[in-house]
């Protein structure tokens, strides 16, 4: 049972803190933590490790090797570039498991532990961790991508359930592609808001005023996507076949300096196949829109997106253990 696990963390940054606190709040035993800096962790616990331990009942700060020696399951929450070297610097054994928390790094980066008999895997929460305390509150309901063989896979699935999250299983070799996909709905949103705010600034509005207006609209769009799906939940003139409005947008943005017009053309063109998919515009309207945008038609997305319905088997909610 996961409740009997001694869980350890090597790396006490924002991700390590958020996961450790989440596990502890779920009734799991986070027994030890070490700094992720240095080849094998500092013999004297770093300030961040001590802070994490002090805020986690039953947890002690110690050197990285001591974490491995004490715990059944070790989370390697170091920067991506340090995963392989941090793992290789430690002595592992049969009966212990180690997982890294990177979305982009392959699990084979932990091969040094596997070669010594340990089980290895990946455990990547699809959530942002700018503020660890806020991340603890936002983690339930999120998806956690796991990759491991048995018996570690079953343990990780149970842990995801304890956190009231969803499991996403990833086959080997797909981590970079998977992690890139997350960017479209994470940091790329910042670029979209930045571009919109720059347009608002052209008439003297501030970024704060732009955000105050745009955030409720963005939340409404996300709610529509959640309830109706990607294509059917899309608002805006393209979804209505309003070629005239798009023409006016192009003319207005052409008068601005910078790359706003090219950005608009690229994004607007990518919504045309979605409007065709949902059946709200015909092929002739799609061609007219592309002509206004001076873009080439894109391949239409698969029809399966129209189906809505339950989540795919790869991303289902997992009930918590009793």
Protein language model regions, located:
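Phosphate-coordination loops involved in phosphoryl transfer and adenosine-cofactor binding
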Residues: 3-4, 95, 141
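NAD(P)-dependent Rossmann-like dehydrogenase/reductase catalytic/cofactor-binding core
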Residues: 212-322
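Internal alpha-helical scaffold of NAD(P)-dependent oxidoreductase catalytic cores
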Residues: 19, 26, 47-55, 134-227, ...
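Rossmann-like NAD(P)(H) cofactor-binding subdomain of soluble oxidoreductases
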Residues: 55-134
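NAD(P)+-binding Rossmann beta1-loop-alpha1 motif at the extreme N-terminus of oxidoreductases
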Residues: 1-63
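Structural signal for conserved beta-strand scaffold positions within catalytic alpha/beta enzyme cores
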Residues: 35, 63, 100, 122, ...
